[in-house]
Amino acid sequence: VGSVKGCVHQAVGSVLKKAGVAFIGSHPMAGSEKQGMEHASGDLFRDATCILTNDEHVHEDVLLLLQRFWERVGCHCIRMKAADHDSSVARISHIPHALSALCVHSALDGGDTKLLGLVSAGGFRDTTRVSMGEPSMWAEILAENAPAVLERLDEALSQLGQVRNWLAAGDKEALREWLKAA
């Protein structure tokens, strides 16, 4: 179970297979920015997607056992290659986490934190909630998935550059279309 699969499959997949141990990666797409037993939830996996990565081609019977486990705790399962998993989660989890932290840093760097606390509302809270996740864990996730994260980050920087150009040019229509497409 974990947020990055490629490095795990590379490091242990073939070794375990040679030793006769079945290895299938699992990543339930569920979680919270909160840590500790006091924040445990019996509903955490309800209706969540669990990604199974079977790059070592473990026999279908074993894969189905693992799939049934995840289904019994409430997940529905999909299968994909580790590289596809890492690329996908970079887009929908890792980059959003980094951008959430960026929003916090951008708001606080040089700003009046007391005033900002008074005027911030739901949009800021919703955008920055995930940045409250455990920093050491997230640093590890981002670093382990660096190739996919860097590719997505370059795409995000390119789009931010375009937004900056539209703002500098006063191009409200381009901004409107970009926001509408989101």
Task: Locate predicted features.
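Rossmann-like NAD(P)(H) cofactor-binding subdomain of soluble oxidoreductases
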Residues: V1-E38
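Residue-level detector of flexible, active-site-proximal loop/helix-junction positions
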Residues: K5, A30-E33, H57, D84, ...
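Conserved strand-to-helix beginnings and helix N-cap segments that scaffold or border functional pockets
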Residues: H9, Q35, E60-L64, L153
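Short, flexible, solvent-exposed loop/turn segments with mixed acidic/basic and small polar residues
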Residues: E38-L44, A139-E140
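Internal alpha-helical scaffold of NAD(P)-dependent oxidoreductase catalytic cores
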Residues: G42-M132
